[in-house]
Amino acid sequence: MTQVIVGENEGVESALRRFKREVSKAGIFNDLKRIRHHETPVEKYKRKQRLKNRTKRRR
């Protein structure tokens, strides 16, 4: 779970910006999109292949 602690002198806008950044880093929106709609076996295979290729490129 993503959590952002707001400092005393910190504005709400900057805290919200930090929260959005943390959520996007964690990949929460991508998981939600995948869970909300049915994923066919072909889509699941393609998603896993894309993820696999990304990890290969990083190495």
UniProtKB/Swiss-Prot annotation:
The keyword rRNA-binding does not apply. Transmembrane segments: none annotated. InterPro entries: Ribosomal_bS21, Ribosomal_bS21_CS, Ribosomal_bS21_sf. It comes from the Bacteria. Residues 45-59 have a biased composition (Basic residues). GO terms for cellular component: ribonucleoprotein complex; ribosome. Residues 39-59 are annotated as: Disordered. One of its GO terms (biological process) is translation. GO terms for molecular function: structural constituent of ribosome. Keywords: Ribonucleoprotein, Ribosomal protein. Belongs to the bacterial ribosomal protein bS21 family. HAMAP family: Ribosomal_bS21. This is Small ribosomal subunit protein bS21. It comes from Prochlorococcus marinus (strain SARG / CCMP1375 / SS120). The lineage of its organism: Bacteria, Bacillati, Cyanobacteriota, Cyanophyceae, Synechococcales. The gene is rpsU.
